[in-house]
């Protein structure tokens, strides 16, 4: 991703029966809102894919992870700064949440790049 400050990873699921509303909200509201936060320069959304390994005795295909959706946000400033601003905007209501987002399953983390010698 070519940034010196890393990425923010968000893993999520829709609430039961709300996949279409969740996808629409993510694409048209939430991701565009996050992209207005200083330090967030890009976003890519992903859906989990089943890994089917060839049949080998003693090796099974891994189970699907608990999260069905992932967003990778590229950052141009420290993740803690971006996370703090996201928190401020969520509390103030400037950043909207939607009933189709299952808040009990959210996974959120910031990742710093590994450079030689660290």
Task: Please place each PLM-identified region on the residue numbering.
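Macromolecular interaction modules
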Residues: 1-118
């Amino acid at each position: 991703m070519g940034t010196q400050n890393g990425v923010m990873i968000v893993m999520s699921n829709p609430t039961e029966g709300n996949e279409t509303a969740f996808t629409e909200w993510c694409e048209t509201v939430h991701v565009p809102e996050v992209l207005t936060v200083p330090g967030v320069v890009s976003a890519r959304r992903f859906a989990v894919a089943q890994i089917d390994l060839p049949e080998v005795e003693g090796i099974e295909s891994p189970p699907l992870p608990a999260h069905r959706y992932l967003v990778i946000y590229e950052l141009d400033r420290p993740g803690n700064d971006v996370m703090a601003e996201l928190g401020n905007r969520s509390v103030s209501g400037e950043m909207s949440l939607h009933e189709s987002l299952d808040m009990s399953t959210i996974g959120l983390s910031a990742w710093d790049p590994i450079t030689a010698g660290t």
